[in-house]
From Swiss-Prot:
Organism: Acholeplasma laidlawii (strain PG-8A)
Transmembrane parts of this sequence: none
Protein name listed in UniProt: Glycerol-3-phosphate dehydrogenase [NAD(P)+]
Signal sequence extent: none
Main location: cytoplasm
Protein family: Belongs to the NAD-dependent glycerol-3-phosphate dehydrogenase family.
Binding site for sn-glycerol 3-phosphate: K101, G132, S134, K188, D241, S251, R252, N253
Compartment(s): Cytoplasm
Gene of this entry: gpsA
Keywords: Cytoplasm, Lipid biosynthesis, Lipid metabolism, NAD, NADP, Nucleotide-binding, Oxidoreductase, Phospholipid biosynthesis, Phospholipid metabolism
Pathway terms, separated by semicolons: Membrane lipid metabolism; glycerophospholipid metabolism
Protein EC: 1.1.1.94
C-alpha cells in the first residue's frame, strides 16, 4: 500500500519508517527544503537515526496523487490550512489517518471535525486517529509500543490496525470511540505541561502521582462532554498516554512545563522549542470550553493563568491547595 505523510516532523518521519518496515511505500510531504533533503539522504530530520526506504517531496499534489491513504502529521494549529490546500488539489476520495493531538481553540473542534469542515463530502472516504502512549524517540529505535486506531468506520480502523502492526515492536488495538480517543490525546498534553511545571518547581513524586490521578478525571470530564465514552479515558489513549507524557523527559510538553517551573519565561520556552508544544493550545482550548460551558477543570484553568496571564507557579499551586475541601469523586 502507498501512504503519503503530510508533515516530515519527528512523529511523521518516524511513522513513515514504521510503514516502510512493514512493507509499505511511503512518501513524505514537507514545506521545509532542509527536512526533505535530509529524508532523501536517509537522515531523520530530528534524531540521530538512519532511515531507509522513504522518499520526501516539496510537491503537495505529488503526495496526494501518490497515496492510497494520507497520514496527517502536522501540528493542529496548521491542520485547517493544510486540509484546505489538500482539498483544492484532490481529484479522488481521500482516506485520512490523523496522528496529531489537539483541539482547536475558540471553535473547540476536534481534528475529525476540522476534516469534515474542510474536505468536500464527495472527496472524504474515511477518517481514523492513531494515538496512544508513544515517544517518537523510542519508536524510531524500534522499542515496544502499543497504540490505538479509532474510527467510526469499522473496516477502516481495522485497516489502519493492520497497516501499522508488526510482530517485532508495534501493536495496534482498535476502538469505535473516535471522540474519546481524540479528546484524551489532546487534553493529556495540557496535564503534561502542569506535571513538568510542578517538577521544575521542585515538587516530588507524591505531587506528580496526585496530579496524574486528578488530571485523568479532568480528561474524563472533557471526553464525556464531547460525547465520548468515559471508559476510553482509562485506556491507552487516556491514562496510558498521560502517564508517558506527564512523566518523561522525552515529552516536549513535560519539558516545556519543566522550564516554566524552573523560572524560564513562557515566551522564551515556546520560542526556543524545536517542536510545537501542543499542550499550550490544548490549555487554551480547554479554558475556552470552561468559559463557554461551565465545565470545571481546576488544574487546567489555573495553568491557563500561568501560561497566558503571568501567574507565578507558586501562586498557582497555592490556589489549588486553598480550594474548598471535598470528598474524592471518581469521574
Amino acid at each position: 500500500m502507498k501512504i503519503s505523510v503530510i508533515g516530515g516532523g519527528s512523529w511523521g518521519t518516524t511513522l513513515a519508517q514504521v510503514l516502510t518496515d512493514n512493507g509499505h511505500e511511503t512518501l513524505i510531504y514537507d514545506v521545509n527544503p532542509e527536512a526533505v533533503k535530509k529524508i532523501n539522504n536517509n537522515i531523520h530530520p530530528f534524531f540521530d537515526n538512519k532511515i531507509t526506504g522513504i522518499r520526501a517531496t516539496l510537491d503537495l499534489k505529488e503526495s496526494i496523487d501518490y497515496a492510497d491513504y494520507i497520514l496527517l502529521a502536522v501540528p493542529t494549529k496548521f491542520m485547517r490550512d493544510s486540509l484546505r490546500d489538500i482539498n483544492k488539489l484532490a481529484t479522488r476520495k481521500l482516506y485520512f489517518i490523523n496522528v496529531s493531538k489537539g483541539i482547536e481553540p475558540v471553535t473547540l473542534k476536534r481534528v475529525s471535525e476540522i476534516v469534515t469542515d474542510e474536505i468536500t463530502p464527495e472527496l472524504l472516504g474515511a477518517y481514523a486517529v492513531l494515538t496512544g502512549p508513544s515517544h517518537a524517540e523510542e519508536v524510531i529505535e524500534r522499542k515496544l509500543t502499543v497504540l490505538t486506531a479509532a474510527s467510526d468506520v469499522e473496516w477502516f480502523r481495522k485497516s489502519v490496525q493492520q497497516l501499522f502492526s508488526n510482530q517485532s515492536y508495534l501493536r495496534v488495538y482498535t476502538s469505535d470511540d473516535l471522540i474519546g480517543c481524540e479528546v484524551g490525546g489532546a487534553i493529556k498534553n495540557a496535564i503534561a505541561i502542569v506535571s513538568g511545571m510542578m517538577t521544575g518547581y521542585g515538587l516530588g513524586e507524591n505531587a506528580r502521582a496526585a496530579l496524574i490521578t486528578r488530571g485523568i478525571l479532568e480528561i474524563v470530564r472533557v471526553v464525556v462532554h464531547y460525547g465520548g465514552k468515559k471508559e476510553t479515558a482509562f485506556g491507552l489513549t487516556g491514562i496510558g498516554d498521560l502517564i508517558v507524557t506527564a512523566s518523561s523527559y522525552n515529552s516536549r510538553n513535560f519539558n516545556a512545563g519543566l522550564k516554566i517551573g524552573q523560572g524560564t519565561p513562557v515566551e522564551q520556552v515556546l520560542s526556543e522549542s524545536k517542536m510545537v508544544v501542543e499542550g499550550v493550545r490544548a490549555i487554551q482550548a480547554a479554558k475556552d470550553l470552561c468559559v463557554q460551558t461551565g465545565i470545571e477543570l481546576p488544574i487546567i484553568e489555573i495553568t491557563y493563568e500561568v501560561i497566558f496571564n503571568n501567574m507565578s507557579v507558586k501562586e498557582a499551586i497555592q490556589n489549588l491547595l486553598t480550594r474548598e475541601l471535598k470528598e474524592e469523586v471518581i469521574a
